[in-house]
């Protein structure tokens, strides 16, 4: 691998360890030329299904869009960035596990809601209010009552 500091190909791995529950390998590398150290992450490249939107159009899965929606729901909530990444990785893992080439956007929304329910109940309600298109306070109340059970 090329050194990001001096662009030479003389780099060696000095440490490797599993991260993200074993789905990634973190490697510390050292350049043989300039002796700078840097970190790389390696993971299997698997196909994530395309998303079928509610209007029938299809688009590639967008991890940034998922992350943005989850982070928006978690805004000002006490949830670590590491927990958010684990939730996103779990959603992606579940999408890959379907074995389908295309999945409905509703599935992504349901998976996100399930992860948010585990992370933070307030964020779950925030996300659900948009995802489920709450029209009035009664719908909030019904969803909150479901959480209490």
UniProtKB/Swiss-Prot annotation:
GO terms for biological process: negative regulation of DNA-templated transcription. Keywords: ATP-binding, DNA-binding, Metal-binding, Nucleotide-binding, Repressor, Transcription, Transcription regulation, Zinc, Zinc-finger. Its cofactor is Zn(2+). GO terms for molecular function: ATP binding; DNA binding; zinc ion binding. Residues 49-139 form the ATP-cone domain. A zinc finger (unnamed) spans 3-34. Belongs to the NrdR family. InterPro entries: ATP-cone_dom (IPR005144), NrdR-like_N (IPR055173), RNR_NrdR-like (IPR003796). Pfam families: ATP-cone (PF03477), Zn_ribbon_NrdR (PF22811). Negatively regulates transcription of bacterial ribonucleotide reductase nrd genes and operons by binding to NrdR-boxes. It comes from the Bacteria. This is Transcriptional repressor NrdR. PROSITE patterns: ATP_CONE (PS51161). Binds 1 zinc ion. NCBIfam families: transcriptional regulator NrdR. Disulfide bonds: none annotated.
